[in-house]
Amino acid sequence: NKLYIGEIAEDITEKRIRHPLTQKVIAIIFSAILFTVNIFYMVKAFDNNPFNYVEMFSDTLTMAHRGSSYEAPENTMLAFENAVKATADYIELDVHETKDGEIVVIHDDNLKRTTGVNKKVYNMTYDEIKDLDAGSYFGDEEEFKKCRIPTLEEVMSYTKGKIKLNIEIKLSAYEPDLVEGVAALIEKYDYKDECYVTSMNYKALTEIKEINEEIKTGYILYSAYGNYYNIDNVDAFSINFSYINKNVVDAIHYRGKQLFVWTINDRKTAEKMVAMGVDAVITDNPVMGKEATYARYSYSLIENVLSYVFED
């Protein structure tokens, strides 16, 4: 079980124990806790994972949007490797199906934006795609020029045991085996407890549940209007952050579902979403996401302790 120090502080604060000696004892206890947390942080820092301890404070997860796409070409192995180094909780990625049935990781159904080739993914074989330059559009660095479009299997082979996945299915009439292919790879790599399959296409989510009801699904919405909360075959909602308020968060949680918000690249907005209690922040910059999560909960802890100790 996780220890949520902020919750302990809040619970004790509510009891309002006012005896001066008791307050001093509590202050000493919390000082010891803060000292222990700082020691834990420094130990983790030596392991090159300075954000590992964030989960002690918060349930809000960080999802690296198309990998760490702030610093590397989106949906490439380099972006995914950087997301792992940033200790993101999830990688959010997009999948399409090639003409010969290979599942590749790319956002657009057309290759032009990231490779310069003006052709649809589903009209090309994997052999025609695998050597395309998928990184030079991002910058002139040699490491970018080496980036290629990976297969989902290649990604899973690398990420298994390192990070969880949010796999967004971009379904079209020209990709008949995409859903089944994704489900098969989740089964092959035993990823069902470590991933969400998300889509704007509700049909894709129902098909995933028909194949394996234990695979968690997320419905992607641009807005938070209407009676969408009780939709079947959906375990989470992924919604544009500009439509999120506390009522939306509470309504979704009341129905036992998760809430992911996208795409947030400034710390102030990220901290605001964390304060509302969203379950995951999707961001191009996972380091910022981790910092925002930690900052919000460390501020809350300090405020609770100071309020309790020094209140008249």
PLM features: residue spans?
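Phosphate-group recognition and catalysis centered on beta-loop-alpha active-site segments
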Residues: N1-D312
